[in-house]
Amino acid sequence: MISNLLPYRPEQTGQTLYDRAEPVSIPASWAVGGGSWLLWGITKLPRMKWGAQRRCRFVDEESLVIGWDGVVSPCYALAHTYPYYTYGRRKEVERYALGDVRDKSLSEIWSGEEYVRFRAKVRHFRFPSCVDCALEGGCDFAAHNQDCWGNDPSCADCLWAQNIIQCP
């Protein structure tokens, strides 16, 4: 699997390849020796351009993240608080906690109203496209986990949903 870089510092923004890179030319698959067995390797490349097709593998594959402290988050991107840079713009991501397995069962958290509503919203991807918005330069929402449609958290400019950054 090959993935793009998620810049955490301003100096890393110049190291991204998406939206400006020439297509990578590598074989889609190859034979790999495995003792007496012949294995077949498959290359899984990320998308290199921002586009309208967005989907969340965590929601589609009914996955979640349980932190070291028992807190349940819907995905890696929302599992902790951190800054990152997308297309040169700083974004502060706040951890999105949907429950704690020390207080409730995983089944209760998964079927809770907030989590069900969040998954439905992500499944239909009802978020604006912040990256290519004409107001993006003067919008305060895009600097945080929010968007102008009132979503908090917002997956509007999630690089994982774009398949620019891939999960293992």
Which residue ranges define each predicted feature?
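Flexible mid-to-C-terminal extensions adjoining Fe-S/redox cofactors in radical SAM and related proteins
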Residues: 77-168
